[in-house]
Design a protein with these regions (language model features):
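Redox-cofactor-proximal catalytic regions of oxidoreductases
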Residues: 46-108
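Flavin (primarily FAD) cofactor-binding/catalytic cores of flavoenzymes
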Residues: 1-56, 109-620, 624, 629-630
Length: 630
């Protein structure tokens, strides 16, 4: 019998097309006979999806270098499926350049010609890579598997546990009838919180402008008037995008004059007053590699440590149980690089340092004394607590003094992140990447307290990781300083507060006297996930019938994320998992698994896609009842 089965993948961004590539890789082994159709549903182009779509400003950059971006598995990935090797973004761009730029959009040719493995690319270059990756995955499909693209929005999925699923599309009268549905939904679009709604109503009442959290590339910034005072809450990557769009994006230009970057305004820029909890921008992305030996996989927060924590009766607390091990591992990676690449800046034999470091607890007097003894220069010591709050305890006489301090701070950061003499920071960066995977294991065990998961892991840890390891390219911080010198940007300070009163928005910082008033307020960050406030019609339809629920923790708090099993199977209101529905993405119980990755890092997103693709292929080929590991 010619067995015909089908899968719908809702969301054709990097995650969705990564799944198609894994289906292509494993189908010859697991689905040798019969016919499989994969329906790919997304109003945006397959490969890039919404976030990486080509239709966005060329001024928006990636914050990764081309040599650090791949969609392909390599020998580091512990996956059952075959590795189908392929180029990084850098290798692909070089290949395209060598072939005369075939199939490349006309307006990208110049960037292709100038691209290097370590020059930060535009998001549109990544968009072109993702488009090519999708076509490459299609070409790799065996003859009994085909992909049908639907440029449409999925608005509902219906169907019981025992039978086919109907995927309803906004533009289609008839549903797609399939055996399994995968929701690769990316970040959740959400309605404003009550606090944000109140600010929006206040703005409307007083003829002010309020921009709630959102993807910067999706926001209409034209409401921000030339010369208007605009408060910006948030100093991360969303701010950097905003900064580019309202300056260069409005006709201003940067120019190097005698070794200093100068900004020439167009006169159309608003005046940005920026603040945040830390009061400083994210650290520049490092411009170097490790110079010495890598410390290797986690040593203190290793698999055995994770098993010990999750096997206990008592629930796991982040600061008491996990952070001392995480911090010690990251510090170990840092000092291993310092010793192996820059040993002349250390004062104890490595063997002695290693022995005493391993024996001491994080935060103990012994460890502090050891570091002071072994590492004479304070700037060579790793202090994550000080890194996290660089302005803690400081006060400034006025805005001018704060500005002077921040300029010195940012210049020092740019210099440090460009100088291989400080490659120990790259050791710490890799240590953080490894810690990410270990923390995910503890989260998956369900043993964390509610507060540890929501306040410490989902909020503080993700934030600290982004701030230290996932900041903007250094040239963006050069631009920030140039804009400050040109009077387009001002700094509010740390622990920024905002009030809505007197028909204006007012802001300030406990570290700086005085207040700023403005006629616009922009929240420069992504919205927090919330199933309860989701606006995506598919999420809303499933939620309202109890077929998709917000993750709820043992202590009664909710995380805003979509509840799934570790397999990705979608959990319903009665606690059962739907055997034919899977949800993947950053806003599910599984949490972080980036859709593309640095090469040679055994990326969790690649492992997840491989596992899901193989589960689907096995299940559909077996021909019996369909159950996705519920």
């Amino acid at each position: 019998v010619d067995q015909r089965v089908s899968v719908a993948v809702v969301g054709a961004g990097p995650s969705g097309v990564g799944l198609v590539e894994r289906i292509a890789a494993s189908a010859p082994e697991l689905f040798p006979t019969g016919h499989l159709t994969v329906h790919l549903v997304d109003p945006h182009p397959p490969g890039a999806g919404r976030v990486w779509r080509y239709d966005q400003s060329p001024l928006l950059w990636m914050n990764s270098m081309p040599e650090d971006v791949t969609m392909f598995l390599d020998e580091s990935v512990t996956a059952e499926g075959p590795v189908r090797p392929g180029p990084t973004l850098a290798a692909w761009a070089a290949r395209v350049r060598g072939s005369g730029g075939d199939g490349v959009p006309e307006d990208l040719r110049e960037e292709f010609a100038a691209s290097t493995p370590t020059k930060f690319p535009s998001r549109r270059l990544q968009s072109a890579y993702l488009d090519w990756f999708f076509r490459d995955a299609l070409a790799a499909l065996p003859s009994n598997v085909d992909v049908v693209v639907h440029e449409d929005t999925a608005v509902d999925v219906t169907g019981g546990h025992g039978g086919p699923q109907s995927v309803w599309l906004a533009e289609g009268a008839e549903p797609l009838v399939v055996d399994v549905v995968v929701m690769a939904v990316g970040h959740l679009d959400v309605a404003p919180t009550p606090g944000q709604l109140a600010l929006a109503e206040y703005a409307a009442e007083h003829d002010l402008r309020y921009v709630p959290p959102a993807y910067t590339s999706d926001i209409d910034l034209s409401a921000l008037q030339p010369g208007e005072d605009v408060l910006v809450r948030g100093f991360g990557l969303a701010f950097i995008d905003l900064m580019a769009l309202v300056t260069e994006g409005r006709g201003g230009r940067f120019e190097q004059v005698d070794g200093t970057l100068v900004y020439h305004p167009s006169g159309k820029e608003p005046h940005l007053h920026i603040g945040s909890r830390r009061g400083v921008p994210y650290h520049a992305k490092p411009g170097y590699r490790l110079q010495g030996e890598f410390a290797g996989p986690p040593r203190f927060f290793d698999v055995a440590a994770v098993e010990r924590l999750t096997a206990r009766e008592e629930r796991v607390d982040f600061w008491r149980d996990m952070w001392p091990l995480v911090a010690k591992d990251v510090a170990w990676c840092y000092y291993t690089e310092l010793y192996s690449a820059h040993g002349e800046r250390t004062a104890l034999p490595f063997e002695e340092f290693e022995r005493r470091f391993a024996a001491a607890d994080w935060g103990s007097a012994e460890l502090r004394a050891l570091v002071v003894e072994a590492v004479p220069a304070e700037e060579d010591r790793f202090d994550p607590e000080r890194l996290d709050k660089p302005l803690a305890g400081l006060t400034f006489a006025d805005e001018a003094e704060l500005t002077e301090h921040l300029h010195a701070y940012v210049r020092a950061d740019i210099a440090r992140r460009a100088d291989p003499a400080h490659s120990a920071d790259m050791g710490a960066f890799l240590g953080l990447l490894f810690a990410f995977a270990q923390i995910a294991r503890v989260v998956a065990s369900g043993r964390l307290t509610d507060d540890a998961l929501i306040d410490d892991v989902d909020t503080w840890w993700f934030g600290f990781f982004s701030y230290f390891a996932s900041g903007p390219p250094a040239p963006r911080l050069e631009q920030l300083l140039a804009l400050s010198r040109a009077g387009v940007v001002s700094f509010v300070g740390p622990d920024m507060w905002v009030r809505a009163d007197g028909g204006r928005f007012t802001a300030g910082s406990p570290a700086v006297p005085g207040e700023r008033t403005a006629t616009a307020l922009v929240e420069a960050r992504l919205p927090r996930p919330s199933v309860a406030r989701a606006t995506d019609p598919l999420i809303v339809a499933l939620r309202d019938r109890g077929e998709l629920v917000e993750e709820s923790l043992p202590g009664g708090r909710t995380t805003g994320r979509i509840t799934t099993r570790t397999s990705g199977a979608l959990v319903e209101r009665d606690g059962t998992a739907h055997p034919r529905r899977i949800a993947l993405g950053p806003h599910t119980s599984i949490r972080a698994a980036a859709a593309f990755s640095r090469p040679h890092t055994n990326a969790p997103g690649f492992r997840r896609n491989d596992r899901v693709a193989r589960t689907i292929l096995r299940t559909l080929h077996a021909g019996g009842p369909i159950t996705i590991d519920t």
